Amino acid sequence: MKRYSKQTCEFQRQQAKSKFDKIRKTWCDLLRWGLPHKSTWILSQTEGERKNQHIVDPTHVLALRSFVAGFLEGNTSASRPWARIGTKDSERDDSSENKQWLQHFTDRVMNAIGTSNFYHAAGNFYYDYGVVNTGSHYFEVLPNGAVHVHTLIPGSYYVLNDAYGEAAQIIREFSINVKALVDKYGQRTKDGGRDWSNISSSVRKMYEDGNYGTMIDVVHTVKENPNYDFRDPDAFENKQWLELTYELGAGSGHFWAEGQEFAGTIVDKKEEIFLKEFTTKRKPFVVGKSTNEFEYGEKGPTIDALGLIKSLNKKAISKDQAIEQILKPALQGPASLRKSYISHAPNTFVPLDAKSIQGKSKLEPIFSVNPAIGTLIQDVEDMRQQVDKLYYADFLLFLSRNPKTRTATETSAVLEEQQRIIGPNLQSLNNTYNIPVLEWFMDFVLFEDPYLKPPPSSMEGQALKPEFISVFAQAQKAADLPAIDRYAGMIANVAQIDPRVLDKFNVDKLADLYEDRLYLPAGLNNPQSIVDAKREQAAAAQQRKQQLEETLPAVAKSAKDMAAAKMQQ
């Protein structure tokens, strides 16, 4: 079996890093303005230091907050179902037994997502996605069976794509102190002592000397297992994905060496050891991005609005300077006034000598500053509206910003606008984020959830597929419902004139369409077999009633004749 090599890992890290260096400068600029609190790693800043002191106009901060809240609630809401699971055979899904199990499976998947920290991690992801057009999760199953989702810090990870533009390898860099490293990755012998077989000699010495605070640079790489054999999937260590964690550098550490790059030397090249070697059958990371061609997204609201953001910031500073010049201008006057106690405070006495009074000396502004504040404010407001549009805040907050115009027609118009404007972003999120996240949890529930009921025998060998029912997804799929409603209304109106038009109208199809477009829960519409059985029973009952009504007059006449005959006798 092929052994893993640090040299190979380092070669791949340098390859991935060289690709990231193409956009590093852009990310630094985007993070500095869009997410300054997340620029610590990529800009090598000190932890705890305030990083947004250069931001004066917060328009984009508020717009980004609306963007994150809108996508968190509209795409992956914690308060309502945003996905359901079916099979690729839609006819098989219509079976009552299959539909009930698929609903049960969906509930278990949503429960697994809800009991993890996914929704908190998703909020951080949308911040990264809105600023650098890329976000990444790493999934970790804790020893107690719980799922913890890590949102990776922008700039601390590198990505390599496969031939289809999907992330095939991710390489993380992070710093950890000596004590935390030994506690997390250190092993124990059978007698409870320390097993130092996977810890470098330098780190061991630091730990034994009590030098716990020294930061160690660590690399964690995740890629497809080169030793994976698909012909033997049940083998314990034969799993598709490989995780390798190893020490990279020791000494000051990343956060402790301000302005320096991540250390680039292995602690001890002679010690070809890994802190952790781990294989898993599930791809443990997701890289969501706005475009598929490059390893990282290249299109997004912040990069489109960056010029406006900087201009607004500059205008805010210039406006404050202009107002300051009006209130406290630079003054000129006789030199004799320098001896006076000049003050801008109200109700203040400024003593003057007799010569200054006779010469009618006075102070005058050096510059004639008369800024068009009204024009500047209007220009700033126009730019703020453009920033809101680039972050979709004007659509996401339409109802809250227009509380007096919440008519059904306008609400429907907003949904159609969301479909057209947010649609491209949603498609990208589906391919690079929603589907991978949901498929990871689906696989986790299938193999790890003890409360999942066994599927019906009729579903054996069927491939499962996720379907999204979020607010944004409904806005896209339900776009034809207004036209269907108009058609149904037309049929109802025409039926009052000529009821024969109802023969053309398929009510069952209408019910099925609404169930599909609105993603209604399973079981709300009866299966077609039950509907047909009920209609057959109703038709049989109607037929018996009709037969009874037809035979009743003859029976009554016979009874009357018999009664008359008895009376004659």
Describe the residue ranges of each PLM region.
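C-terminal anchoring/interaction modules
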Residues: 1-22, 26, 34-35, 41, ...
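Extended, helix-rich architectural segments
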Residues: 1-214, 221
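A general structural signal for short secondary-structure junctions and capping/turn motifs
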Residues: 125-131, 148-150, 205-210, 229-236, ...
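Short, hydrophobic/amphipathic alpha-helical patches that form generic packing surfaces
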Residues: 25, 32-33, 62-74, 304-321, ...
